[in-house]
Structure formats: structure tokens, C-alpha cells
Amino acid sequence: CPTSYGDSPYQSFSSFAGNPYFIDLEYLCKEKLLKKAECESFPWGKKADKVDYGVMYESRYKLLKIAFERFLRAEPDDFEAFCEKEADWLSDYALFMALKDANGGNAWFSWEKDLKMRKPEALAEARSTYAKDIRFYQMLQYLFFKQWWELKAYVNEKGIEIIGDVPIYVA
């Protein structure tokens, strides 16, 4: 789940979405969405044994935006099918994240009233206005789940089961 400020898995934006922090950048290099030199050109924090989430967030999202521009030039054949299959949660999640960005990262209850109240006209206008940003968040989930399913298949072949936890404090 994508985490909120404080980076706690129990303070997330979705119970369904995968955390973009776990998208493997080397994998994106192999897919020609990023270049190794681009990944190496960004700061990742001063200490190898400590995660600086602020620095990581800034660098990672800049790189993911670069990957997105390349992704748009040749969307994979299965991308649209993924978006349709996961539409029950992905459509609203991607819209929410795009609106959160458009509102400076502020909480939804501080947004324009018609958006807060999910008025159909306001949501339709937002979907049109922020279509590219929505696509970015859909791409992040596509990449996350593509990698997740490959990892899960690999470890399951080795007789390893993965267990996890569900974020229940979504607000």
C-alpha cells in the first residue's frame, strides 16, 4: 500500500494499491523505461544503512515520471486489460492520487466542496483535466503488480509462501 506522511504501512492511501517504493528500478532499466545512469544521478540519502524517505520519495518519483514519459510512447499490450480488470479500485485510487497532487498534497477534506462531496460533474471534469496524472498512477500500479506477480510466481515455484498484512487504517 502506498504510505502517507510518516511512511507507516498503517497510514496508507489505499488497501488495494501497491507501494511504488517497491517498484524495482533495475527492472525498469531492463524494460528500457529508465537508464542506469539516470538512476545513479539521483541522491538516495547519505547513509547506506538508513532510509531517508524524503530523499527517496523525491528521487524515486522524478525517475518514475521519466519512466512514465517513455511508457506512454509504447504502452504494453496488457496495460489496458490491467486497468479494466482492476477498475473497481484503480480508477478511484488513481483519480484520488492525481487530485491529491493537484491540491498540493493536502488532505481531501480541504479540497473544493464538489470534489469532497464526489459530485459526478466535478469528478468527470477532474478525470478530464488530470487524465495524464491519472494514467501515471495507473502505470505505477501496473508496474508494481507486474513485478509482484513475477516475484510471487518465482518464490512459489521454490516452495516459499508469502504472507502479509492488510492496512486497515485507510481514511
Walk through the language-model features, giving the residues of each.
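Acidic/aromatic-lined carbohydrate-recognition and catalytic surfaces
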Residues: 1-171
